[in-house]
Amino acid sequence: KGVIAWGASMGGFITQALAERFPKLIKSAAPICTAAGNVSSELTYAGDLLWGLKTFFDPSITVSGYADGPAGVGQAAQNLGKVAAVLRHISGTLTETDISKTWPATSPMPATIKAIPARSALTLVGLMAGVPTQSQHIDGSSFPGTETGFALALAPAIAIAQNAGYAAGLGIFATLDLERRVGGAFYDNTATDYAKRIADERASFNVALSGNDATNGLLSILSSPYGKRIAASDQGLNGLKAQLAHKGKALVPTITMTGTADMITPAGNSQWLVNKNLKNTKKFLPLWVVTADKWTKFLPTGSPDTSSTAWPSGTGHCQFSYDQTMTVAKLAAAAAKTGSVPSNASVEKTVAKVDGLLFDREFSMPLLKADQK
């Protein structure tokens, strides 16, 4: 008999920490859809998203530095409402021919920037933060009829808008909670190079960003007085550094599973663990829940149908099927008995029977933006 440690999301973070600190207490571990490292990169992901929304669309959005007591809770709730209002407006004006009307009334942007569709600014914000460009209703490649421009121009912004609401919620309430624990603001983007952040994506998302001139114009805002950077307090930064953190190496048989388009704990978290265990194949086994080729459906108007409440494979936060979850459980149980994860051949045979599940040690996902060098 033995103990298998299991946790999802921040529960996965705790599971990995337990396995590293007290490996003799457990036989195997399964941190799924987990945050990883010291959570700083995860919080930076959400903070960068909020800062981008604040900069382009509503300066009253709070990124960090919440008030104490009930006032801070109210501030966070109002903040979520402001983010939702921005995303609703942009999503509702995607096909507006008067470009200036695509911008929320709260936007402080000059007329030169408002000549660029707001969806392009939202796409930029999502890309620089690392928000997935596939979502519950958007596969990123489908288009209505012969309108191929949808996938190139509109789909990224729609997917980012759908995912950003969830990611912003994480950023708002996790920041509120952690600032109180560490004693101050910890988000800091004073040295962040956002142009470098999107260097790899600006070509592939060029149409969604409305071309090179528009992209350069939007990026210029981020280093102008409109894009006032935020500095952490010494107490907040030191307090964050003192929080629980991972070293990353699997000391007990460890199995991860993550959706490739998870918008709360993006797949880069699990990739961080993968990178720490590239040669540790007897103790570490990464599984991925991958997206299908297509799942977007369209209304007769040509707009995407967003009525479905189902989460397609690989999308959503910790949205795993029964078969996927039970596969992890069975593999973790087998590993607990032997002290090693099952062989590659055995795992391949098992995973081949489960829809949407991938085992491939050569497969990789981008790290979180803050972890990319």
Please provide the spans of the model-predicted regions.
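C-terminal His-loop and adjacent cap/lid subdomain of alpha/beta-hydrolase
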Residues: 1-373
